[in-house]
């Protein structure tokens, strides 16, 4: 009775210990998914990871950890896999969206144009609409990072940055004419 009231009874371990593993993968492996082999207690475990692995994601494989140290009839612990997805210098991952930046001459931003940008899937043609502005973000649906375990992807977000070439006297005169025409049109 005393032990029951004050918790003096020791709890016994009901299963083996969990095994924790840190798994480092590249951005491309995380995006495309991969098969990975783990060796636990001399046994090889094959795990298939679907496309869309994220940094910090945890996976628990029940019964794939350590056996119970004293009783082989009790269940094994679990294998806990903690993922680390390396950053990519060309792409910024934000949720399931991938951000990229593209530099364009200011006149192409104003007039509009077609550009080709590098994505994790390769080159992609994008239309920059006329009357765009520096810092504008173009959103392309379903071209971002895969959503883990689903047949779905985030968006590709392309931020347009302006470049300003050195202008000669004639170019500056054209700009002055455009400015003058615009001021007259606005009254």
Where are these regions (language model features)?
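Intrinsically disordered, low-complexity linker/assembly segments
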Residues: 43-44, 48-187
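Post-J-domain flank of DnaJ/Hsp40 co-chaperones
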Residues: 1-39, 68-75, 80, 182-187
